[in-house]
From Swiss-Prot:
InterPro entries the UniProt entry points to: DUF1328
Keywords carried by this UniProt record: Cell membrane, Membrane, Transmembrane, Transmembrane helix
Originating organism: Rhizobium etli (strain CIAT 652)
Electron transport as UniProt keyword: no
Protein name: UPF0391 membrane protein RHECIAT_CH0003936
A GO CC term assigned to this protein in UniProt: plasma membrane
Membrane topology: Multi-pass membrane protein
KW Phosphoprotein (keyword) present: no
Annotated compartments: Cell membrane
A matching Pfam family: DUF1328
Spans traversing the lipid bilayer: 4-24, 33-53
């Protein structure tokens, strides 16, 4: 489960880079939405992994 949390974290960082660097207006909007969604999913999976008692990293 922690693997998925890290995958969504990387996706959110990449989407955030494109969304906040001023690539284009349409791309920026889509990237900002994906950044938010991936960040929320990352946090959910991180909390679930910690609650399950799995080792972090």
């Amino acid at each position: 489960m922690l693997k998925w949390a890290l995958i969504f974290f990387v996706i959110s960082i990449i989407a955030g880079f494109f969304g906040f660097s001023g690539v284009s207006a349409a791309t920026a909007t889509i990237a900002r939405v994906l950044f938010g969604i991936a960040l929320v999913i990352f946090l959910i999976f991180l909390v679930l992994a910690l609650m399950a008692g799995q080792a972090v990293l």
